[in-house]
Every structure is written in structure tokens, then in C-alpha cells.
Amino acid sequence: MSLSTSELLELCGFLVSVAKQGGKIITSAHPSSSDFAAKKNSADIVTETDTAVECMVQAELKSRYPTFDFVGEETYKTDQRITEAPTFIVDPIDGTSNFVHGFPAVCISLGFVIGRKPTVGVVFNPFLDELYTAVKGCGAFYQRADSERQKLPLLSSPLRGLGPACIGIEWGSDREGVNFELNLKVFTTLARTRETGGRFVNSLRCTGSSAITICRVAAGQQDLFWECGNWAWDVAAAWCILNEAGGMIVDGHPGEWDPPINNRRYLAVRPAPSGQKEIVEEFWDVIGDDRSTYGPPQ
């Protein structure tokens, strides 16, 4: 099934209105350490607000688009698959731990895919009133509050390798085993001086929200974002925004330039007139032969 550009633009506008409804729920909540439950450990938190936002989003989307599939973080089942059908992929609150701690890097992420390819993306941070949107073939845009909408990227220059790069990277919730060891290797190799076997990159940033970080990559404000262990709802909306801005997402493991939406390993690269391929290969060289256990569902 395909939708016309006008239909996709209409869908995007509807997603923006739904995202702003969700934003009101998020900003009206007052989470504390007494009302959250740990999913896996204290670094992976789910709140009642997640569920409330997702229920609202699902109801609104099903009412308007009853035949489209829906995949949401809070209602996901382990046997659920993303098919070729038109599918909404939703993270009601990306940056839940930030939300609980009052750190305003929090967003609602509403993605739409057709044929498992990012087609529409809406990412809204209600605390900073920042909105990122994209429709396939129509470009990507950023708007803060009532300011004029700006086309992405906001900044663009050649990529000049890892040395001068500002890289988004996260520890994730695995703090032992091979996944943690790979994170540790990548972190330390990027940070170390060249004299001690590292790449001595300009800066590493842990924001706590994959969607927001990928949008910053799309804006040209960060050069790369790497994480293994993410889910499709963490990246689907921002992926469309990055693509439309002229950036790209490749596999978080070396070798695959066109990973599936549910790959669970992602390396995002900002828009640039040159240097994208070279910086990807340089980053993959940091990973080397080590691998995480994450990958698309079998």
C-alpha cells in the first residue's frame, strides 16, 4: 500500500496534533521515585505516564486510521513483528529516566513506516516546546514554540573524521556481559589519546533520549549517534527526520549500510557534503571484531 504525498502531509499534521496532546499529559504529570517501577534495573524506568500517553495515542490513531498497524513501547509483545503494512511506531516518552529526574531531554516520538521504511516522523519535546517533523520526499523541519519553522539541517559542513567529532552515545541498561564490554571498549577507544591507542574525539554526549539525539544529528548539532540495544520505537520517527535532512543511519555493527527498522543496532550520521562514508568506516574500525548480542527479531 502507498499513500500520496498530500495524504502523508495530512497524516503528519495529525501526528503533530496527537504529539501535542501527549505533551500536555507529560508536562502535567509530576513523577517521583515513589511512583515508578523498574523494567530491568534502575536505569530503565517506566512510569504510569508512559502508559497514559500511549493509550491516548493509540486511541487517536486507531480512530483516524483504523486499518493501519500499531507498535508501541508499552503494548509491545515479544512475538509482534513489523510487517510491510503501514505501521505507526510509537514511543510515548523517550527519555523516561530523564522525565522521572526532571531533566528536560524528554520527547514523544511518533513514527510511521510503509514497507518497513521510515516515511513520516514527528518528535516533540513538550518541556522545551521543540518540534521536529519530516515526510518522505518533503524535507525535515525544526520549530521551537511559535518561532518560524526552519529546514534541517541547521548547520552543514564536511565531516572530517572522528577526531573533531561530537558523538552521541549511551550506556544503555546492560551493565555486565558482552554488551557492556562492547560499550566500554567503544567509549574508552573514542576517549583515549592516540598515543594510548584511542581516537581522542572532541566530545562524547549522553543525552538519555535516542530520538532527541538523532534529531540533533539531523540538525547538524552532533556528528554521530551510536547505540546497540535500542528498539524501533526509539528511532523510527527520528530516522525519517534524519533521512530527509540528508543524514543516514547504518548498522551499529560493521558492514550493513541499509539496516532494517528493527535492527536494534544503529549508527546515525549527520548531513554533510562529504565525509559520511569515511566516518562510518572509521567508527566501524573502532568496533572491530567485537559484537553485541542485539539484532533484528528472528
Locations of regions flagged by a protein language model:
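Short helix-loop capping/hinge motifs at secondary-structure junctions, enriched
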Residues: 140-142, 146-149, 174-176, 273-278
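Conserved beta-loop-beta connector loops within the AMP-binding
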Residues: 147-161
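Oxyanion/phosphate-interacting regions
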Residues: 2-12, 16-17, 23, 185, ...
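Residue-level signal for inorganic ion chemistry
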Residues: 26, 50, 61, 96, ...
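Short, Asp-centered acidic motifs that coordinate Mg2+ and/or phosphate
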Residues: 120, 166, 223-224
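Short loop->beta-strand "edge-of-pocket" segments that line small-molecule binding or catalytic clefts
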Residues: 157-183, 187-207
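DPxDG-like acidic metal-binding loop motif
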Residues: 82-145, 149-151
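N-terminal subdomain of lithium-sensitive/metallo-dependent phosphomonoesterases centered on the IMPase/IPPase/PAP
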Residues: 1-93, 293-298
